[in-house]
């Protein structure tokens, strides 16, 4: 499928996402980044997959936009400094709060659970994760429940 056809049929997804997150400042820049990502996604989409193109684009563009927000605010999130130091004499170290939480979560998980979580956060569906990890769908569901249980037990 040519990108012009994809664009004509699905460009409203970009407008919807920008409206959903109330983007008014830098609207054109975000639109352009999402349009480039839409082109990239249209190149890797497999029509034989069970997911429709519109669903595929919406999910991946939504996660991409969230990643853009995180990158933009990465230096604004958390500043960590030593408790003993009354003044900042050294360069402060910046950490993204989400990255710190993910690091804590990843420490609790085994290798299969970490891979599942990574793929899930990238926007893959369960059946896609099952194909990538070469596991059955029921095993993927068990891994999902295990990750959920560990997170609830340790972070709630």
From Swiss-Prot:
Matches recorded under InterPro entries: RNA_pol_sigma-70_dom, RNA_pol_sigma70_r2, RNA_pol_sigma_r2, Sig_transdc_resp-reg_C-effctor, WH-like_DNA-bd_sf
DNA-binding interval(s): 126-145
Top-level division of the source organism's lineage: Bacteria
UniProt record, GO biological process: DNA-templated transcription initiation
Chain span(s) of sequence motif Polymerase core binding: 29-44
Keywords: DNA-binding, Sigma factor, Transcription, Transcription regulation
GO MF annotations in UniProt: DNA binding; sigma factor activity
Alphabetical list of Pfam families matching this protein: Sigma70_r2
UniProt function note: Sigma factors are initiation factors that promote the attachment of RNA polymerase to specific initiation sites and are then released. Sigma-S contributes to the protection against external stress, thus playing a role in cellular fitness and survival.
Similarity-based family: Belongs to the sigma-70 factor family.
Protein name as catalogued: RNA polymerase sigma factor SigS
């Amino acid at each position: 499928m040519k990108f012009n056809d994809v664009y004509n049929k699905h460009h409203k997804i970009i407008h919807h996402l920008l409206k959903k997150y109330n983007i008014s400042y830098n609207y054109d820049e975000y639109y352009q980044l999402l349009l480039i990502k839409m082109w990239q996604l249209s190149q890797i989409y497999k029509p034989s997959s069970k997911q429709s193109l519109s669903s595929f684009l919406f999910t991946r563009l939504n996660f991409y936009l969230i990643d853009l927000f995180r990158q933009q605010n990465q230096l604004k999130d958390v500043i960590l400094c030593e408790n003993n130091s009354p003044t900042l004499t050294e360069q402060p170290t910046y950490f993204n709060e989400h990255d710190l939480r993910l690091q804590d979560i990843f420490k609790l998980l085994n290798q299969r659970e970490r891979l599942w979580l990574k793929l899930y956060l990238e926007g893959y569906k369960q059946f896609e994760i099952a194909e990538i990890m070469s596991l059955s769908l029921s095993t993927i569901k068990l891994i999902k429940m295990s990750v959920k249980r560990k997170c609830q037990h340790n972070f709630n």
